[in-house]
């Protein structure tokens, strides 16, 4: 058990030293529209939205629990402990100025922390998932 906890906590130390979250500020799009657009963009990237949790009303915050099942299967096959961190969580937060922040854990830094436990193929899968999520968020912003 102790070894398992150490395996899970070491990456957090790496994350604490570097940028822990990837965030994008979205302006000019209402909060509820961002939620709909993000769900649609994630679906387009084959990132299944497994659950949506409205965390608070003031400020409004929602968490999407997302997973690409084929990515998850490839990673869990070689690193079953990853199940403690799955699925990916993407938050949507309404800021005081009316903008909306969308973010999630910085996956490249997560890969750095777990590198010795991941095969090169699993690392590639993580980085592809990161690319897919970033592209979905940028699509919400209006970029392609």
Swiss-Prot record:
The keyword Signal applies. The keyword Signal applies. Keywords: Signal. Residues 1-16 form the signal peptide. This is Uncharacterized protein aq_1800.
